[in-house]
Each structure stands twice: as structure tokens, then as C-alpha cells.
Amino acid sequence: MNTKSVKDIWKAIEFGEWRKPTSGLAPGYTQANVVILPKKDAFDFLLFCYRNEKPCPIVDICEPGQVAPPVAGPDADIRVHVPKYRIYRHGELDKEVDDIKSYFTEDMVTFLIGCSFTFEKELLEKGVPVRHMEEGKNVPMYVTNRQCQSAGIFSGPLVVSMRPIPAHLVDKAVEITAPFRKAHGAPVHIGDPAELGIKDINKVDFGEPPNIKEGEIPVFWACGVTPQMALKNARPELVITHSPGYMFITSITDEEIARL
């Protein structure tokens, strides 16, 4: 699957042949978090992303009712090309579904937000291990004690993803990821999880628990699940997102996203 074209991957997702997390899928292409919400809430959400660019770097925005992201996937259909979606009603998770054709209306605005899965290929190619990819797991994600800047109806805490990195490679990991500004860039924290309010690193809020080996340091990047916490607080009537770890594969290459 990893060697297939992006269009082949979209088709596989649409027909139910891929229903797993997308870390490591389509190496060399940018992955994106998905937030779809009514037009009346779109400006407040846009402002929230602008004020919190580290966890919410915007890759693309659709017009109301538009299903093909004009920059990130002009041949895609956002309603069927994500492996798993979440449906939120009034801030509460209602269900997870495989497509959103029955929920998407002409009033819905789609936001694509950068994802740290994008820089994992670069880490691997330059000798920095990525544990969850080695083990075929979803990345560990945590809600922190850091608050984002509020905007309109949206407010909430920063969410981070974590990758255990051998101590001697931490500086290298920072250097590699920093240029990927549209994929969260450099880490927001290195070391003690307690400083982020994480009491037990083995108890994740999203994803799967980590396997941290001796001599490794937990390294935390801002995460595009952050908007889902803000959406829960804002309690809009209906919001659709990707399920954490099940991203939209864009047709933008890693080289292109690093230049944005």
C-alpha cells in the first residue's frame, strides 16, 4: 500500500480496503487533520487557527459545500477519502463512521490542518527512529495543561503527540522537524511529561500507549487534535473531524509543504 499513488490510496479508503491509522502511509506526501463545520462557525474557527498556528497550521480551506480541497486534493472527495471520521453533536462525540455523505451539506466548510505524520519519513531517512511506526501502532497523544488562545466560541487546551527519541538524537530530531512549519514544526516540549500536566505517560488521551526504552527521552510536538478539544468546548450543533491518527492524505509533497 505504501508504494501506491495518492489516488490509489483514496480509492482504497473509499472502498473500505484501508481502515487503519495512516502513519507511514504514502511516504513523501503531506497528511492533514480534518475539521468540517457549519459556515456560521467557520470564521471563529479560522481565527482560532490563526491565533494558534503551532497546533493548527492551515494547509487548505474549502468553500462551503466544496468536497475537493482545492490545494491539497483537487481530485479528492473529503466525504469518503478519510479512513475514519468522528461526528460531534453539541460538543459530544456521537459516533465514528467510514464516510460522511449523509452528514455533509452545502453549508459545511472543510479545514485541513497540518499533521506531524508528514515529517516522519524525513526522521527515518536521517536515522531517527519512529517507534509507533516500527510497532505498527497509532502515535500517543495527550491533552496538556497549556491553554490555547481563544477565538470567538473556540477555546481549549493544547494537545501534543509524543515520540520517544534516543537522547543523542534529540537535537537532530529538532533540526529535522523545525522546517516543517505546516506540520507543527519543532517540538513544543522535551523531557518531563509532568511539566505538560501529563501524570502518567502510559495513559494516553488519544492513540496508543508508548514503548519508551532505556536511554530515550519523550519529545512532544503540537498536535492537530487540538481543535477537537476546542470544538468540544464550543459545542456547535454539528462538527465532523477525522478520527485521531486516521488522516487525510493530501496530494501535496513533503518538499512542497516544507516551503510553505
From Swiss-Prot:
Highest taxon listed in the record's lineage: Bacteria
Keyword annotations from UniProtKB, A to Z: Lyase
**Cell inner membrane as a keyword?**
no
Biological process per Gene Ontology, one example term: glutamate metabolic process
Give the transmembrane ranges: none
Known EC number(s)?
A: 4.2.1.-
HAMAP family recorded for this chain? Hydro_lyase
Q: Provide the family line.
A: Belongs to the D-glutamate cyclase family.
Q: NCBIfam families recorded for this chain?
A: PRK05463.1
What is the protein named? Putative hydro-lyase Amet_2975
Q: Which organism is it from?
A: Alkaliphilus metalliredigens (strain QYMF)
Upper classification of the organism: Bacteria, Bacillati, Bacillota, Clostridia, Peptostreptococcales
